[in-house]
């Protein structure tokens, strides 16, 4: 059984920034859902919904100077060690107002409005989930810019990166980061094409529930898109649009050649069998938990298990611009 651990601290606090004009001017942008949005830049009071590390890495060490609020739980609750490290290195994070979290239903339009922002930045999944709740934001004349790193496509990563560059006044840096990302993706795809091997059937599962219960898999987003990008045949693509459960019998019937179980730090003390990966996770602990998934009913006969191609990956390394780093 082989084991892969992906974890990296984006050196946002080490990045320098150039001068930004003090006078705001209207700039029209096209966001990742194709909306034409006019924003007065530089924005002075920004509320961020997600993609904080990317915003900081692109915008530099003063990127948060004009940020007044964010959805704290998406970072602090989903990746506590990452939050602890960043909030210590960047004290401004502790001063930002918390507007709640979309996925658990605590996101507060009232809290957003109370901050009197001149820009709201959301992930596409947040924008879609909030739906008509955003009417009040629109009526207040607050522009909303939608980003999408979750799609995990080169096009959306590049577009989102360049949008952040425009919003933070760091277009040149954003262009370089976007070009670097595309170069890495193109190199991977060129190598896959040159190898000219049969596409392995791939199954990826978020291992937060442990071996006893199947959790979500990924279709055309996150790990599903990554599997496709690197030349795999994602067995969930025809059953799951973005992410969601799949019938365990379908996994057995598909006979995947490769299985990837993703994990994070949060489950370390919550569930003794759940997959854990990331900051401060002992390798032996992660390997022990990964081995538990190989013992699922029927899995012993799968090609992935027979051929020792069961892997673990850090769940938080899907979505960010840094997903191309080793």
Protein language model features and the residues they cover:
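A short, structured surface patch at a secondary-structure boundary
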Residues: 49, 54-111, 119, 124-125, ...
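Alpha-helical, coiled-coil/dimerization segments enriched in small aliphatic residues
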Residues: 215-242
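Extracytoplasmic ligand-binding site segments that recognize negatively charged/polar headgroups
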Residues: 75-81, 126-132, 147-160, 196-225
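Bacterial Sec-exported substrate-binding components of ABC uptake systems
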Residues: 21-58, 172-204, 313
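Proline-aspartate-enriched helix->loop->beta-strand connector
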Residues: 101-104, 108-125, 142, 248-264
């Amino acid at each position: 059984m082989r084991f892969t651990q992906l974890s990296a601290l984006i050196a946002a606090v080490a990045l320098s920034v150039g001068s930004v004009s003090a006078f705001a001017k209207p700039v029209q942008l096209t966001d990742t859902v194709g909306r034409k949005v006019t924003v007065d830049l530089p924005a002075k009071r920004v509320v961020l919904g997600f993609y904080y590390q990317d915003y900081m890495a692109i915008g530099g060490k003063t990127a948060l100077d004009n940020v007044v609020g964010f959805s704290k739980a998406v970072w602090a609750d989903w990746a506590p060690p990452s939050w602890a490290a960043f909030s210590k290195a960047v004290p401004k994070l502790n001063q930002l107002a918390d507007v709640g979290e979309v996925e658990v239903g605590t996101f507060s339009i009232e809290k957003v409005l109370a901050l009197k922002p001149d820009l709201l930045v959301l992930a596409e999944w947040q924008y879609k989930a909030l739906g008509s709740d955003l009417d009040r934001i629109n009526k207040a004349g607050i522009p909303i810019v939608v980003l999408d790193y979750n799609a995990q496509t080169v096009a959306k990563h590049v577009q989102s990166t360049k949008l952040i560059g425009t919003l933070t006044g760091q277009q040149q840096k954003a262009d370089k980061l976007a070009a670097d990302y595309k170069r890495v993706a193109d190199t991977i795809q060129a190598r896959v094409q040159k190898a000219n091997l049969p596409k392995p059937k791939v199954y990826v599962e978020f291992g937060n529930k442990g071996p006893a219960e199947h959790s979500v898999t990924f279709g055309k987003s996150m790990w599903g898109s990554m599997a496709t990008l690197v030349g795999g045949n994602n067995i969930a693509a025809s059953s799951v649009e973005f992410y969601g459960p799949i019938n365990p019998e379908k996994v057995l019937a598909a006979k995947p050649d490769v299985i990837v179980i993703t994990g994070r730090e949060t489950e370390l003390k919550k569930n003794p069998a759940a997959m854990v990966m990331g900051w401060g996770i002992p390798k032996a602990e992660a390997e022990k938990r990964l081995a538990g998934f190989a013992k699922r009913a029927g899995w012993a006969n799968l090609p992935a298990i027979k051929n020792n191609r069961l892997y673990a990956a850090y769940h938080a390394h899907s979505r960010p611009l840094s997903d191309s780093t080793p």
